[in-house]
């Protein structure tokens, strides 16, 4: 099953994979999406690799073979450190998609809402709920989106009082590219947004994919490139 949101010159495609969901595309508008067009984007399994090759799963769970940074990090006194959520229900319109997941073993419920507006801006909001007895220690809950292979540079911002928002641009390399803020607010060194772009992109033309954490407290922004060249961008508090 596919869910395709198309608005404001932007598309995002969700693909149901068993009891979970992956994001098959986020970026330029698509006129038509089929199961066949999504299937051809699947990466081959290399010799000596895992028998499953998870793509851009929304929750990026290690229990499903994901080897990068997860969406959720937390535990119950050292237990339930690796989650395995399943779809409970979902609802889609032409420009919105809401899905509820549950991990019965961990005692967690997770709701994620996607809204794609008329300007092509995608808003993502995640809410996690502890539905079991005892405390759950939440460490991180990040939202992630896939990037295409032509995204090979990062543009973000740094600064200090009287000279904030200075741009810096550099190549995407293997591993995590991270910008974090620990001031309890969006201070002078806050990057505002982290942008993945092609090295040929300039102020007049080219492709760019921007992710902003709309939060005035501590914040984290990631771009991750795995050894199989899987690229993604994400962030949270």
Could you say what each language-model-derived stretch is?
Residues 18:
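Contiguous, structured surface segment used for ligand recognition
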């Amino acid at each position: 099953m596919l869910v395709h949101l198309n608005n404001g010159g932007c598309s995002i495609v969700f693909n149901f994979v068993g009891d979970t969901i992956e994001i098959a595309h986020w970026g330029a508008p698509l006129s038509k999406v089929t199961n066949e067009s999504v299937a051809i984007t699947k990466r081959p399994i290399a010799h000596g690799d895992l028998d499953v090759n998870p793509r851009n799963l929304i929750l990026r769970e290690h229990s499903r073979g994901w080897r990068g940074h997860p969406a959720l990090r937390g535990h119950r006194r050292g237990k339930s450190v690796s989650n395995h959520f399943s779809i409970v229900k979902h609802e889609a319109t032409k420009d919105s998609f809401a899905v509820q997941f549950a991990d019965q073993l961990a005692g967690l419920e997770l709701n994620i809402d996607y809204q794609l507006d008329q300007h092509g801006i995608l808003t993502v909001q995640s809410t996690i709920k502890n539905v079991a007895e005892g405390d759950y220690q939440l460490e991180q809950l990040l939202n992630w989106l896939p990037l295409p292979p032509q995204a090979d540079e990062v543009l973000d911002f740094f600064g200090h009082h009287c000279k904030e928002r200075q741009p810096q641009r550099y190549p995407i390399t293997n591993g995590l590219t991270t910008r974090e803020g620990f001031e309890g607010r969006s201070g002078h060194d806050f990057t505002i947004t982290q942008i993945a772009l092609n090295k040929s992109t300039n102020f007049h033309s080219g492709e760019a994919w921007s992710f902003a954490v709309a939060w005035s407290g501590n914040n984290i922004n990631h771009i991750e490139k795995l050894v199989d060249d899987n690229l993604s961008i994400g962030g949270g508090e």
